[in-house]
C-alpha cells in the first residue's frame, strides 16, 4: 500500500524549512510521496495577509519540481470556503488521483496540533488519518505529551496509540522550523529572499512583486 504524506498549510510563502521537513518526514516515516496542500481560505488566518491562492500554488510547484516524490495538489481551490482539513481529506480520498488504496499521513506542527479540538470534526480526522507531529522551535514537548494523554493516547514503541483512533507519530531530530512570517519579516527588513527560499520561489516573488 502506498504511503502518502499530506502537508497542509498556507505556504505564504513556501520556504526551505518546509522542504527540509517534508524530506525528513518522508525518510523517517518511509513515505512514498509528499503532497503539499495549499489552503484556499484557512479559518485561522487573516485573509488580508495572504497572497492569492494561484501564486502560492505556483511557488509550491516550482519548489517541488526538483523532487520526484513531492507534488502540489490544489483541490482546496474547488471546495467550499473556509478550508477545513476534514473536508479536504474526504475529497482527496474520493478523487481519481487517489482512488487506489493508500495510507494517508498528515504532517502537522505540534503548535497547531494542540489546537486540534477547535478543528471541524477533529475526532473523524483522528479516526481516518495518521498524524505525524513535527516539533516546533521553542515549543515544549511536555505540552504535546499532556495533550495526547488528555485525548487518551498511550505511547508505545510504535508511536502514540489509541483504542479508537489511528496511530500518531512524532518526528525525532527534525530540523528547527522557521515560519513564513519570519521569512516575510526578513524580506521587509533586508530585501533578502534567497537565504531561506528556493531560488525559483525567490525569483517568482521578485518577478511578481509579492510581499
Curated annotation (Swiss-Prot):
Q: From the UniProt record, which GO molecular function terms apply?
A: ATP binding; nicotinate-nucleotide adenylyltransferase activity
Question: Which GO terms of type biological process are on file?
Answer: NAD biosynthetic process
What's its catalytic activity? Answer: nicotinate beta-D-ribonucleotide + ATP + H(+) = deamido-NAD(+) + diphosphate
* E.C. number(s) listed in UniProt: 2.7.7.18
Which key words are in the record?
A: ATP-binding, NAD, Nucleotide-binding, Nucleotidyltransferase, Pyridine nucleotide biosynthesis, Transferase
For whether the record's keyword set contains ATP-binding, the answer is: yes
The source's superkingdom equals Bacteria
Cross-referenced Pfam families? CTP_transf_like
Q: In which pathway does it act?
A: Cofactor biosynthesis; NAD(+) biosynthesis; deamido-NAD(+) from nicotinate D-ribonucleotide: step 1/1
First-level EC class: transferase
**Which CDD domains does this entry report, sorted A to Z?**
NMNAT
Keyword Repeat in the entry? The reply is no
Similarity section: Belongs to the NadD family.
Q: What job does this protein perform?
A: Catalyzes the reversible adenylation of nicotinate mononucleotide (NaMN) to nicotinic acid adenine dinucleotide (NaAD).
Classification via HAMAP family: NaMN_adenylyltr
Q: What is this protein called?
A: Probable nicotinate-nucleotide adenylyltransferase
Amino acid at each position: 500500500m502506498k504511503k502518502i504524506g499530506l502537508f497542509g498549510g498556507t505556504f505564504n510563502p513556501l520556504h526551505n524549512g518546509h522542504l527540509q521537513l517534508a524530506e525528513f518526514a518522508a525518510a523517517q516515516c518511509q513515505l512514498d510521496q509528499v503532497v503539499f496542500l495549499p489552503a484556499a481560505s484557512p479559518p485561522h488566518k487573516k485573509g488580508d495577509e495572504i497572497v492569492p491562492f494561484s501564486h502560492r500554488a505556483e511557488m509550491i510547484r516550482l519548489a517541488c519540481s526538483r523532487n520526484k516524490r513531492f507534488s502540489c495538489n490544489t483541490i482546496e481551490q474547488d471546495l467550499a470556503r473556509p478550508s477545513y482539513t476534514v473536508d479536504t481529506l474526504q475529497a482527496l480520498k474520493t478523487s481519481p488521483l487517489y482512488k487506489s488504496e493508500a495510507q494517508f499521513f498528515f504532517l502537522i506542527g505540534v503548535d497547531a496540533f494542540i489546537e486540534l479540538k477547535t478543528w471541524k470534526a477533529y475526532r473523524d480526522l483522528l479516526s481516518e488519518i495518521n498524524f505525524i507531529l513535527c516539533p516546533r522551535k521553542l515549543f515544549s514537548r511536555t505540552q504535546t505529551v499532556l495533550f495526547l494523554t488528555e485525548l487518551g493516547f498511550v505511547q508505545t514503541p510504535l508511536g502514540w496509540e489509541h483504542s479508537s483512533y489511528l496511530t500518531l507519530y512524532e518526528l525525532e531530530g527534525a530540523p528547527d522550523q522557521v515560519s513564513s512570517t519570519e521569512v516575510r519579516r526578513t524580506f521587509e527588513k533586508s530585501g533578502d529572499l534567497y537565504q531561506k527560499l528556493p531560488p525559483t520561489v525567490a525569483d517568482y516573488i521578485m518577478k511578481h512583486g509579492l510581499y
